[in-house]
Amino acid sequence: MELTKERFIRDFKDILHERQLIKVADATSVELFQALASTVRKYITPLWLERRNQLIEQQQKTAYYFSIEFLPGRMLETNLLNLGILDTVKEGFAELGVDFEDVKNAEYDMALGNGGLGRLAAAFMDSLATTGYPGFGNGIRYRYGLFKQRIVDGYQVEIPDAWFGSLGNVWETRKDHDIVDVKIFGNVSLHANEKGRIVPLYENSKTLRAVPYDVPQIGFGNDNVNNLRLWDVEIPEEYELDYPTIEARRRVQDITAILYPDDSSYEGKELRLIQEYFMTSAGLQTIIKSYLKQGRPLKDIHEKVSVHINDTHPAVAPAEFMRLLMDEYDLEWADAWNATVKTMSYTNHTILSEALEKWDAELFKNVLPRVYQIILEIDNRYVAEMAGRSLDPQVIENTRIVKDNQIHMAHLAIIGGHSINGVAKLHTELLKEDTLRDFYSIYPEKFNNKTNGIIQRRWLQIADQPLSAEIDKLIGKGWRSDIHELRKLLEFKDDKQVLGDFYRVKQEAKARLADFIKESTGVKVSTEAIFDVQVKRLHAYKRQLLNLLHIIKLYWDLKDNPDKDMVPRVFIFGAKAAPGYHFAKSVIKLINEVANLVNKDESLQGKLKVVFLENYRVSLAELIIPAADVSEQISLASKEASGTSNMKFMMTGAITLATLDGANIEIKDEVGDDNIVIFGMDKDQVYEHYARHDYYSRGVYESNPDIRRVVDTFVNGTIPNVREEGSEIYEALITHNDEYFLLEDFHAYVEAQEKIDTLYRDKEKWARMSLVNIATSDKFTSDDTIEQYAKEIWNLEK
């Protein structure tokens, strides 16, 4: 959009005076943020309405992206950038004497997700708007998100993340005209109506009111605005008597209170199922109502609507869609099923069997009795169809939806849709060959790969503005709208002046992070050290513990020889553990106690520092990632579906230290063997161990003095205050046979770390590697990923 500095200043002052009754000089940063965000909303609104009217008039096919998580972080700067007015606003603030950074930092991160799943969903919203496709998000308006992490005495403590603050979410708009009701619980019996149709009769069900809040998603440089719809829950006035107690009302409020409520109890499992169904049913109801306004037959809805299931949380969608089409709109089974399969598509995000969602059949039947009936019918018809094709009975049993008193949600998504995709080449291969091989034998045409991507605007233009400015000097600003122009940087990979400038920019980013570390933890770190970073969800398969084992080895090396020749190293962690995940919490405690041990030991001469930055989130990632020298991507080969932090680090010039897992393989293909450091077993070697059952971690431990010394450190009193946690980790590695092969990969990892040390000593070579990573990161833009989804799965047009 076009905006002069003078008009912006006038608009901003008017809104500040109108909303806050205050002058600029007297306003707090929060008041200034609220006024600025309201000003931006004023600019967005006509564009938003224009987009809505355009879609209604043109009746374009629209994709709806259902995800339990969306993790956009702060939205102010992204919205300003995408509108093309970021520089204008900064200039206006400078004239007003306002610090833009202070105002920007007054915004809370939108706490609607946890990790990569939510960040990917948010990136896709940005890319859909930027590429011009009609695509809307559908999720939950969590009041407290996952949790805010505090580290107390080394332990993770979870507190509510009250990200709404006292003023709410300035970006959202409540849409009362799209409110719908969602029924749960009760009994359902089937009866013939006056037309002879079998219809359900509900008794003793509970009714929830689903209230939509829309958040605009602005395209970069095109004034295009799509929509992220978030659902909140209310008790309908006409059903107030169904919720007579405070406890009953609280249980309703819990549905949209937090992401991933603890499911270790029956009540927790029930709440999760209700949460997932609530979001899915509400979204599908409004999609159908919107489609019917076009005056087209409902049986042809797939021609104008695509519903995408992001992981298994919304995988009840095919069954709920069938319920709506048949029970609410009188479609026959055949027409409803045809429309459902052609409308639905599904992204799988894991090969870990425990992460493929399953529900106890009795619990499911109790919460969603009619949907349960429909799932049984889908399952029975599937079994009959496959038997009619003379399939192996064992294959049929392996792939059915209802078995062993469980409902397999991934199976429902595959059978009830026309597409299933993995999120990296290796991941998709593993789905075909292993996790879902029986399904692949039945439906090979449904399987495809869509490697994940990231938003370059967030991670370069916003998070690393100094690097962006250096790139502008070299190749112009064309890359900002066409990321593939980054490849032009390769022309400068042997230019010493350019390499020196890139190295300087990285050092400046490290200095900014070092200041934050000192301020937030009290630990002083040197920017001359290698900043070695692992920031991601804490999970055993991601192997933060392997990183810690190496740190302990370095500690003992330095205790044995304080004069050891090594480049100083700062290991930086950021991670949240799921509240009920005891092992992950123990790893966090160990990292923090090792940090205390190392950072206070003056005999190490500052050569080794360990920092755990609490409450890892998008806005913190924007500070950490540009400052990283080394990107730790060390999951056990075959366990990480894709990863996206690896791409963000790559784009800002970190060198990837990685196993051949997920998208690391594709990063290696882009940068070449000389610009990445690979170690450890590949997936074939891991699978050979599984097949032969020949891995014996105690044997590795007992036969290797270095490993024994490191592992014993957990239980011999060297690390204070970890008696229970140290024993738990020791048991996991030795007694329980080291499930993720840390000890098997340990020596290869140590050698890779030594290679990092050697490479970093040659600053020019390191800067060249960094430049090559930046230049080839264009491969991983989510704009291209969305183009593939739109053309190959959703069949959309711009």
What feature does the model see in each segment?
Residues 1-798:
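A conserved ligand/cofactor-binding region detector
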